[in-house]
C-alpha cells in the first residue's frame, strides 16, 4: 500500500518459467499488496514456479487467449481484489520491478493516472541490447503516433504500465483486441478520455530468455499501431467513429 492506496501487480505470462523468479524476487512488497499471475496456456512450468514462490493468485487460461486477452484477465482480477493502483509488469525480466515505487507514487499522488516505464527515455535502449531494427522501428512508430494522437511520449510499446482504478473503470478496454495491439488501443483510449500519461526511464534488458515477438508479428503489430492512430485522429475530427472510443 502506498499513500493509503492498494497496489496490485499483474504478471501476464507466457512461457515465463525461466525468468519469473528473478522478476518476482525484485518486487517491492513493502508497497505491493497483491500479485496476480496469469499463464496464457504457455505449456511450461510457469504456474509451478509461481506456486513455489508463494504467489497466491495463480490463474491459467485453458486455451491461449493472446497478449491482450491475458491483460484483460489480469485487470479484471486486480479490480476484483480492490486495487487502487494496477501495475502491469512482464515476468520476462526485461523491465526492472524496482521502478514500481516510483510509478505507484506518481499515480497515488494524483500526478499522473497513467505511468509508462519507457525504455527509450534516456540513452540506454541500445546499450541494454535492444536490436537496432527494433529501436528504429520503435522511434518511427512513436513519432507517427505522437503526431496523430497529439502526445509527446517517448514510446507506446512498453510492457510496463501503471493505471489508477479510475482509468480502468472509465475506458472500455474489454472491447480491445486480444492480440498485441491491445497496448496501443488502451493508450488511445486513455488519451481520448483525457487522462494524462507520465513516463519514467526504465533500463532496457534484452537477453536470450526474454520474450519477444518475431519479425512477421512485429510487422503486423506495426501496421496495427498505425491503424489505431489513424482511426483515433479520424474519430477526433468527427470523420469516422472509432467504436473503442467514447
State the predicted function of each range.
Residues 83-92:
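Short beta-strand-to-loop acidic/aromatic patch adjacent to the donor-nucleotide binding site
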Residues 61-63, 67-80, 97-180, 207-226:
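Acceptor/aglycone-binding surface of glycosyltransferases and processive sugar-polymer synthases
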Residues 39-47:
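A conserved acidic beta->alpha catalytic loop
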Residues 14-29:
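Short, well-formed alpha-helical segments that are part of the catalytic scaffolds
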Residues 4-7, 28-37, 56:
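Short loop->beta transition adjacent to catalytic acidic/histidine clusters or analogous donor-positioning motifs
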Residues 16-19, 42, 96:
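Donor nucleotide-sugar binding loop of glycosyltransferases
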Residues 1-3, 150, 174-246:
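Hydrophobic helical membrane-anchoring modules
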Amino acid at each position: 500500500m502506498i499513500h493509503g492506496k492498494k497496489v496490485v501487480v499483474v504478471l501476464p505470462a507466457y512461457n515465463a518459467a525461466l525468468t519469473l523468479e528473478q522478476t518476482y524476487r525484485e518486487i517491492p512488497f513493502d508497497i505491493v499488496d497483491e500479485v496476480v499471475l496469469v499463464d496464457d496456456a504457455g505449456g511450461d512450468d510457469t504456474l509451478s514456479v509461481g506456486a513455489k514462490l508463494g504467489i497466491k493468485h495463480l490463474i491459467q487460461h485453458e486455451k491461449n487467449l493472446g497478449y491482450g486477452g491475458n491483460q484483460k484477465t489480469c485487470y479484471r482480477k486486480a479490480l476484483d481484489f480492490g486495487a487502487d493502483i494496477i501495475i502491469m509488469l512482464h515476468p520476462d525480466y526485461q523491465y526492472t520491478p524496482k521502478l514500481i515505487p516510483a510509478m505507484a507514487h506518481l499515480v497515488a499522488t494524483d500526478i499522473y493516472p497513467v505511468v509508462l516505464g519507457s525504455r527509450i527515455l534516456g540513452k540506454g535502449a541500445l546499450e541494454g541490447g535492444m536490436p537496432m531494427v527494433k529501436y528504429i522501428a520503435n522511434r518511427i512508430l512513436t513519432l507517427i503516433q505522437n503526431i496523430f494522437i497529439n502526445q509527446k511520449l517517448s514510446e507506446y510499446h512498453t510492457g510496463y504500465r501503471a493505471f489508477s482504478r479510475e482509468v480502468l473503470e472509465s475506458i472500455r478496454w474489454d472491447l480491445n483486441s486480444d492480440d498485441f495491439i491491445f497496448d496501443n488501443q488502451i493508450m488511445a483510449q486513455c488519451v481520448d478520455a483525457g487522462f494524462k500519461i507520465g513516463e519514467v526511464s526504465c533500463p532496457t534488458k534484452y537477453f536470450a530468455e526474454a520474450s519477444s515477438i518475431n519479425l512477421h508479428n512485429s510487422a503486423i503489430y506495426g501496421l496495427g499501431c498505425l491503424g489505431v492512430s489513424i482511426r483515433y485522429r479520424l474519430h477526433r475530427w468527427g470523420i469516422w467513429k472509432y467504436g473503442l472510443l467514447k
